[in-house]
Amino acid sequence: MMDGKHKGEPEPRRVRVFFYGTFMSAEVLARYGIHVENVTPARVHNFDIYIRPRVNLISKTGASVYGGVVSVTHEELDRIYQGLEKQFGLKYLPEAVLAEPIERTAESEPVLCFITAQMEPGAPDPEYVRELATCVRALNLPESYALQIESFN
């Protein structure tokens, strides 16, 4: 056995996911026991972000949202989104989107993005808003986007 796995056992399948909340941060993912090798700063068109009280996306022609694309396992996604459902009562479901890397060194790619269809309006948690703006800046996403995030406080 190596690393708790049987020799010759295949690695779990990884899928590409666009995170637009604090999960865009490798440090935040690590708090959930999820270790990613690379976070690709990216943009997704025709969506807008809102925080009321948690972060979510809404369809909006001409708008763009920013975040990070990572490779994670289905088990890791379950851990994240089952935790959010248990803690906040929010059911985020996967949607396919096209993520465009900020640095044009790679092609746009289809990725999963998790969005909730229903969220009761509420005041955002100021600490969460600050943490999200910090994550945006850490990925060198546009400062105007960090300011947009901060405007939810």
Indicate residue ranges for each PLM-predicted region.
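Glycine-aromatic micro-motifs
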Residues: 2-153
